[in-house]
Design a protein with these regions (language model features):
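Cell-wall glycan-active module
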Residues: 1-335
């Protein structure tokens, strides 16, 4: 079907890197049919810009018959994104100006983050971006500032964070505060996390740690939080247990054997193959057969296969079955 082939050609062609030569015959037929439009060429130019493929970007620019001046400006910004400091050249109302500025600032941020933030603020004041684009770009810049924990950009980060409503960025800011031992900033940003994140073991633990640095009332609250956290079976629960001298809560639950379901196992040819493969020490083949076997059954039946494996001393297969059956509380089987 020619239409299917041409649809596939479009999907293949719209890519930010050079495609293999084997694709050329398909692309040529697609182009002859008049389906490679100027809009598509421009879209691929933007993709190649994002991928850092200047050669492809330059080649595509020569295929344009319209918007040649815009293409020249895009190429110029790619080569030197600091050109964006000449704000008047990118202040027109055309949508492409906002696109060039957006992509140029992202590229500049990889070379000179401080300059990128400075220029972003100037363009933002002149309403260069739509609300959505401005939000996405500010998120990108804030993330880079948080990754590098650039002290000179902390005020920018602290101004933008409340506007972005992003748990992952707030968590990065909290880690920054922990690294520099800034309890005040930690207490400022913890409430900006969603309630679910605030109540997670990680941030419950660190809230208690920060409270330990406070007055006696806060220290007492920290002990209460740690005691409660120590009831959980996770890294922070175990760490809290160490801090309050309480035993770890393993919460073991033995998987119950279902005699009726166990009888069904004896008729399973797949299980017979696993048994024979293990007998001749074909461990990899037995494991592959075991995984296929488990995939044929629901969770209740997978539990019984897990029990069968452990009973027969097939410990690695038992662990695999416990994972698929989600037997997270059967500690003896999992470990």
């Amino acid at each position: 079907d020619q239409q299917v082939a041409f649809d596939g050609a479009k999907s293949l062609w719209l890519y930010g890197r050079t495609r293999p030569e084997e694709c050329d015959p398909l692309f040529q037929e697609w182009q002859k049919a008049g389906l490679r439009t100027q809009e598509l060429i421009w879209s691929r130019m933007l993709l190649s810009f994002e991928q850092g493929q200047y050669g492809l970007l330059s080649y595509l620019s020569r295929q344009l018959t319209t918007n040649k001046n815009d293409a020249k400006r895009l190429l110029a910004v790619y080569k030197d994104p600091r050109r964006l400091r000449h704000k008047s050249k990118y202040s027109g109302s055309a949508k492409i100006n906002a696109t060039i500025v957006d992509m140029g600032l992202r590229r500049l941020a990889k070379k000179d983050l401080k300059q990128a933030v400075k220029l972003y603020a100037k363009y933002q004041k002149s309403d260069r971006f739509s609300d959505y684009k401005g939000r996405q770009l500010s998120r990108y810049l804030v993330r880079r500032a948080l990754i590098y924990q650039t002290e000179e950009l902390r005020s920018f980060v602290d101004t933008m964070l409340p506007l972005l409503d992003s748990d992952d960025l707030v968590e990065m800011r909290l880690r920054w505060a922990l690294r520099v031992k800034d309890d005040q900033q930690f207490q400022r940003y913890l409430p900006q996390l969603s309630q679910a994140k605030q109540n997670s073991p990680r941030w419950t633990y660190w809230r208690a740690r920060i409270l330990q640095n406070g007055d006696k009332q806060q220290q007492q609250l920290a002990l209460q939080i740690l005691a409660s956290l120590s009831e959980q079976r996770n890294f922070y629960g175990f760490t809290a247990a160490n801090m309050v001298n309480k035993p770890y809560r393993i919460q073991h639950q033995t998987t119950v054997i279902d005699p009726q379901r166990q009888l069904q196992l004896t008729d399973d040819r797949g299980l017979a193959r696993v048994t024979e493969l293990l007998a001749i020490d074909k461990q990899s083949d037995a494991r592959a057969e075991w995984v296929m076997l488990l995939n044929r059954y629901d969770k209740p039946m997978q539990k019984q296969y897990a029990v069968y494996a452990v009973t027969n001393g097939w410990h690695s297969l038992g662990v695999q079955a416990s994972i698929q059956a989600k037997l997270w509380n059967d500690m003896q089987m999992r470990f």
